[in-house]
């Protein structure tokens, strides 16, 4: 693992994607690694960078596997934070629904440190959005 690339990716996630500032609060929701989906080191790396490097008010919540009512517990505390980053499958349950809180939500599909250090994860999020918008414009303006 290259620490420089890791820091670039962490900054990309927290500053470019989440648009967090020093006075913001962050809840990191991490699925217990015993379920095999997410490596625990990913959420710990984000927590440490957010808290120590960016000075954010940061909390880490470890959750179990998704269940039909598991989102209810999280919904109760989401409004206490400016942003919630999910390293947990539970964050994907409401992908197409209207959010029930004003908290900014980010569902991360990065499952380990290696994928966080990938060229995709370290590429500037804002520039990737410009690229996506350009592609969408071409597609949506096509004649057939």
Short names for language-model regions:
Residues 1-144:
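Active-site bordering "gate/hinge" segments
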């Amino acid at each position: 693992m290259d620490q420089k690339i890791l820091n670039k990716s962490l900054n990309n996630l927290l500053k470019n994607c989440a648009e967090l500032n020093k006075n913001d609060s962050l809840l990191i929701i991490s699925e217990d690694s015993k379920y095999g989906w997410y490596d625990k080191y990913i959420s710990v790396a984000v927590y440490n960078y957010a808290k120590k490097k960016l000075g954010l008010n940061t909390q880490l919540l470890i959750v179990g596997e998704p269940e039909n009512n598991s989102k209810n517990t999280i919904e109760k505390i989401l409004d206490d934070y400016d942003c919630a980053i999910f390293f947990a499958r539970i964050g994907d349950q409401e992908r197409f629904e209207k959010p029930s809180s004003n908290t900014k939500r980010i569902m991360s599909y990065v499952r380990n440190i290696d994928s966080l250090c990938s060229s995709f994860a370290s590429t500037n999020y804002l520039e990737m959005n410009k690229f996506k918008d350009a592609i969408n414009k071409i597609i949506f303006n096509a004649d057939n």
